[in-house]
Amino acid sequence: MSEPSAKKQKFANSLEALKATGTTVVADTGDFESIAKFTPQDATTNPSLILAAAKQQAYAKLIDSAVQYGKKQGQNIDEQVEIAVDKLLVEFGTAILKVVPGRVSTEVDARLSFDKDATVKKALEIIKLYEAEGISKDRVLIKIASTWEGIQAAQELEKEHDIHVNLTLLFSFAQAVAAAEANVTLISPFVGRILDWYKASTGETYTAETDPGVISVKSIYNYYKKHGYNTIVMGASFRNVGEIKALAGVDFLTISPKLLDELLSSDEPVAKILDPESAKAEGSERVSFINDEPKFRFELNEDAMATEKLSEGIRKFSADIVTLFDLIKAKIQA
């Protein structure tokens, strides 16, 4: 049904064709100098992306500025480092917001993933730093891992503080349901990392249509539309453009510069695959997790892929934030 409409209009490239399906394109990078040509609406960052960008000479001034700020504000070395790292994340976000017209996602320290109160506290500190830069909280999404504690923190931030949250490292239907019930602004269901797990565990080869990560996002999208949830579904973590095209029409897609480049240099058509009306007919029946921690934990535990990938993701982001802390600490002590 949507295939012919994709061909009626000729677009300059596949990226423009993707945007024409109704999907909002988001740049997944901390390297803000590389994203303007893609004209994304928003940008997402994480500790790994910031760490990669921080190692580039082009961003040395941001690091120096954050280090000086940390030295002034902190009472001891540990405080100075923590403040400087928060400041650095916000400096990257502020610079990105000069390039994108929408919002930037800034991640809370992944080591707080199992501490609701500490997550809320850190989110408020990050927003305060943005506001000191003249950035309204409406232009910031606080990224939090989709643990039980993270989802509860997100609910509190949205309800009590009117702070927008992006729940990340989302691999399971239970996480997605609880996130919608928490009324969060946006979720980031991961596609490529789900595919990685299934390829490793089954040894099978998947097409874009049979890709377990693509199927996961479709089922979440259909469920949200069927039950009238306003939470934005933003597919994330892609291994190839086939996965991206298979989700054309979904609310948002956050895409790495490498894959954005591929779309920009291709003139292949992109057909709209997902739409709200069809989704309403295909979504599964309503279930609930938000007030039932044992049920949530059991459902997550039953999903080996989601359990392993959530743990692995938190470990990876935690390791990268520690590396970033060490980098900043060395500069403060130099």
From Swiss-Prot:
CDD domains: Transaldolase_TalAB (cd00957)
GO cellular component terms, semicolon-separated: cytoplasm
Protein name, entry field: Transaldolase
PANTHER family: TRANSALDOLASE
Keyword Zinc-finger on entry: no
Catalytic activity reported: D-sedoheptulose 7-phosphate + D-glyceraldehyde 3-phosphate = D-erythrose 4-phosphate + beta-D-fructose 6-phosphate
Active site: K143
InterPro entries: Aldolase_TIM (IPR013785), TAL/FSA (IPR001585), Transaldolase_1 (IPR004730), Transaldolase_AS (IPR018225)
EC number: 2.2.1.2
Enzyme class: transferase
Entry's Gene Ontology molecular function annotations: transaldolase activity
GO biological process: carbohydrate metabolic process; pentose-phosphate shunt, non-oxidative branch
UniProt KW GTP-binding keyword: no
Metabolic or biological pathway, per its Swiss-Prot or TrEMBL entry: Carbohydrate degradation; pentose phosphate pathway; D-glyceraldehyde 3-phosphate and beta-D-fructose 6-phosphate from D-ribose 5-phosphate and D-xylulose 5-phosphate (non-oxidative stage): step 2/3
Gene name of this polypeptide: TAL1
N-acetylserine modified-residue sites: S2
Subunit annotation: Homodimer.
Function description: Transaldolase is important for the balance of metabolites in the pentose-phosphate pathway.
Family membership: Belongs to the transaldolase family. Type 1 subfamily.
Entry keywords, A to Z: Acetylation, Pentose shunt, Schiff base, Transferase
NCBIfam families assigned to the protein according to its UniProt record, in alphabetical order: talAB
